Amino acid sequence: MQDKNNLCWLDMEMTGLNPETDRIIEVAMIITDSDLNVLAQSEVYAIHQSDELLDNMDEWNTATHGRTGLTQRVRESSHTEAEVEQKLLDFMSEWVPRRATPMCGNSIHQDRRFMVKYMPKLENYFHYRNLDVSTLKELAKRWNPPVAKSVVKRGSHKALDDILESIEEMRHYREHFLISAPRAEAQ
């Protein structure tokens, strides 16, 4: 059910970091309530890309996506970016009104750059703000290093795993880093 206070978490895996030359190869989405309780998760979509594009990935992406099996899943997938964009829009619209949720995740600006180019309707459904866990990570490193060091990262580089890890990391910062005050009912 739609709720303007729900949060939409997203992660993408790409063939590289440049949206002008690289492409999205995996994406997943999770909806939480404002207290970070998971309400729903989308399917994990591997998006078909050409062999030429996959064969030209840099060393890190070739090794990482090869190790996780993503490269093979992408080769075998029949999903297009447009098809996945529509499926994610349909999923998201069940839970969050248009432009109500910030885009949530880790280093989410990078995902947004790719979304602007390859999934613009989905990007436009989000609020223009980002809820980026990496901002809290950078602040904790500088202002409270023990809190930053106590975060355990698995770094699987699988979209769904990375989202769950981002939500867990946000819970950690909420509990150990952010000042806790009595919560007023959201208006």
Curated annotation (Swiss-Prot):
Gene3D superfamilies documented for this protein: Ribonuclease H-like superfamily/Ribonuclease H
EC top class, as a word: hydrolase
Catalytic residue positions: 128
EC number, UniProt record: 3.1.15.-
Cross-referenced InterPro entries: Exonuclease_RNaseT/DNA_pol3, Oligoribonuclease, RNaseH-like_sf, RNaseH_sf
Function: 3'-to-5' exoribonuclease specific for small oligoribonucleotides.
Protein name, per record: Oligoribonuclease
Gene coding for it: orn
